[in-house]
Design a protein with these regions (language model features):
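Adenylate-forming
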Residues: 11-13, 37, 41-44, 48, ...
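AMP-dependent adenylate-forming
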Residues: 7-33, 145-149
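Conserved AMP-binding/adenylate-forming
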Residues: 47-96
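Conserved S/T- and glycine-rich ATP-binding loop of Class I adenylate-forming
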Residues: 59, 76, 173, 179-182
Length: 185
C-alpha cells in the first residue's frame, strides 16, 4: 500500500542544476534550476490549494508548449490533482468537448501563441470556453490577463512557500490525455 508523489522525486537533488529549458519558435531560451523550479511549483501549488483544488480534482491547460505548463502540471501533481491539456489551436468547441468530460476546477490559458511565425491571441476565446465549463472556479493566464477576473501567471509564482507534496496511492491518476485521432490507436 505504497504512497508517494512523483514531484518529490523529480525535484529532489542539487538546487543549482538546470532542469527545465524552454526554447520558443524564435529561438529564445529560458531555463530553470531545480531550486527555481521547486519554488515556482510550490507557489503555484499553494495557489491551487487556496483556490480549493483537492486531491483527485482536475486542472487543465489550454496553452502552448511552454515551461509554464510543465510548472502547472508539477504543481497539480504535487497536491494530488489530475492534469489535462489541449493545444492552443483548438477552437473553443474542441476544448469544451475534451475538458467538459473531466470537469476541471482551474484552467491555465496562454494569452497568445506563435505558430509559423504568426502570433495568435487567445484571450478573446476564454469566455467562450468558460461558458461550456461551468465547474471552472479560476483562470490563470500566461502573459497579459486582459480580464480582471483572471489571474496572471506572474502573480501565481510570486509566493515562496515551501513545497508540500501530497502522497497518493500508486494507482492515483496523474494525467488525462486526449487523442485527436492522429495516433492510429
Amino acid at each position: 500500500d505504497a504512497h508517494l508523489n512523483i514531484v518529490e522525486t523529480l525535484l529532489a537533488g542539487e538546487p543549482e542544476a538546470e532542469v527545465l529549458v524552454g526554447i520558443d519558435e524564435a529561438g529564445a531560451r529560458r531555463s530553470w534550476t531545480r531550486g527555481e523550479l521547486r519554488s515556482d511549483v510550490a507557489s503555484v501549488a499553494a495557489h491551487m490549494h487556496r483556490a480549493g483544488v483537492e486531491p483527485g480534482d482536475r486542472v487543465a491547460a489550454w496553452a502552448p508548449n511552454v515551461p509554464e505548463v510543465v510548472i502547472w502540471a508539477l504543481a497539480a501533481l504535487s497536491i494530488g490533482a489530475v492534469v489535462s491539456t489541449a493545444s492552443p489551436d483548438f477552437a473553443p468547441a474542441g476544448v469544451i468537448d475534451r475538458f467538459g468530460q473531466i470537469t476541471p476546477r482551474l484552467l491555465l490559458v496562454g494569452s497568445t501563441y506563435t505558430y509559423g511565425g504568426q502570433q495568435f491571441d487567445m484571450r478573446g476565446s476564454i469566455d467562450d470556453v468558460l461558458a461550456g465549463l461551468p465547474d471552472v472556479i479560476g483562470v490563470v493566464v500566461i502573459g497579459e490577463a486582459s480580464d480582471p477576473r483572471h489571474h496572471s501567471w506572474s502573480s501565481w509564482v510570486a509566493d515562496l512557500p515551501p513545497l508540500e507534496c501530497v502522497r497518493v496511492g500508486f494507482d492515483h491518476p496523474g494525467f488525462i490525455l486526449f487523442s485527436s485521432g492522429t495516433t492510429g490507436a
